[in-house]
């Protein structure tokens, strides 16, 4: 298994940016692989074209209830089922990381989630 100590400075620095908006780059010659990431706090939003940021240009996916809705049911089994279903969709789309749900993030009326 590759550790940070095994990387050159250049290789380690390359891990601080992605290969594009939706992919973390790997390091050639190591076991650090490239990974696809997606956005979507209510499920998966895998983009069809890596360079396209148009929200309508994504693979079809299920829109699950938001975390606040699921938590208000107090139904732990249902919440686990939703998590498993999101995981199955991620595996189907070869997605390694889902950026969401938003949990304890700073919100402000002037800046939403500050981006």
Regions found by a protein language model. Name each.
Residues 1-115:
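N-terminal beta-rich core of secreted/periplasmic extracellular enzymes
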């Amino acid at each position: 298994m590759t550790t940070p100590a095994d990387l050159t400075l250049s290789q380690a620095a390359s891990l601080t940016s992605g290969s594009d908006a939706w992919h973390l780059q790997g390091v050639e010659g190591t076991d650090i692989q490239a990974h696809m990431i997606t956005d979507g706090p209510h499920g998966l939003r895998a983009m069809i074209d890596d360079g396209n940021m148009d929200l309508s240009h994504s693979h079809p996916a299920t829109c699950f209830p938001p975390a606040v809705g699921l938590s208000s049911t107090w139904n732990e089994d249902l919440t686990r089922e939703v998590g498993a279903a999101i995981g199955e969709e991620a595996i189907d789309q070869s997605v390694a990381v889902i950026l969401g749900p938003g949990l304890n993030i700073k919100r402000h009326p002037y800046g939403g989630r500050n981006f």
